[in-house]
């Protein structure tokens, strides 16, 4: 309903919906500690569970598309617990990724990849193809919730300057904005990005 209402009332900006990824969903259904053991001792059963979770999420994402949403962010935080040798095919957003999952994310075929604040965005952009949108990765707690308007502006400009030569970069929070985050901090982030984008010094194609 929220996606439908947003799509009906917001016409000048893309409306992006969100959902959890198949491995994170499976972990919540099966228990995260249990599934980390089960992927080794019961791989066939876990594959079946992941398949069912994936099938459900495909239907859910299609339903979101039918509401008029421009796209969907699939958050897959639990995949940060996996090593690079654990082969799962859907990895789009990963709060815990410290670099070991980046290659798997690129190979997923997603049109956009969203990274948490645990990674270096400058280093990650060097690994990502220029035709894939790369998003992230301001710390949602330290910067948005615990920071001040001044520090939010400073951190936002710092990341924009670091990534200025990558036109496929879209600045955002590294994960969900926590409850009770000061509204002033969110507004400051948006205003800072808008001013930067309208600056004559901003490289062509920047976000």
Model-based region annotation:
Residues 1-207:
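Active-site loop segments of alpha/beta catalytic cores
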């Amino acid at each position: 309903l929220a996606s439908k209402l947003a799509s009906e009332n917001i016409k000048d900006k893309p409306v992006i919906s969100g959902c959890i990824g198949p491995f994170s969903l499976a972990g919540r259904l099966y228990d995260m500690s249990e599934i980390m053991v089960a992927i080794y001792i019961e791989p066939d059963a876990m594959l079946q569970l992941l398949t069912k979770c994936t099938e459900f999420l495909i239907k859910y994402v299609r339903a979101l598309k039918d509401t008029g949403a421009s796209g969907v962010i699939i958050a897959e935080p639990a995949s940060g617990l996996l090593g690079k040798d654990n082969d799962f095919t859907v990895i789009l957003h990963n709060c815990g990724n410290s670099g070991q999952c980046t290659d798997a994310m690129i190979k997923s075929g997603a049109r956009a990849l969203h990274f948490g604040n645990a990674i270096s965005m400058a280093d990650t952009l060097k690994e990502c193809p220029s035709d894939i949108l790369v998003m992230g990765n301001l710390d949602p707690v330290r910067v948005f919730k615990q920071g001040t308007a001044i520090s939010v502006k400073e951190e936002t400009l710092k990341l924009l300057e670091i990534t200025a030569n990558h036109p496929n970069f879209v600045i955002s929070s590294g994960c969900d904005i926590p409850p009770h985050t000061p509204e002033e901090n969110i507004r400051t982030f948006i205003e800072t990005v808008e001013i930067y984008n309208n600056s004559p010094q901003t490289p062509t194609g920047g976000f």
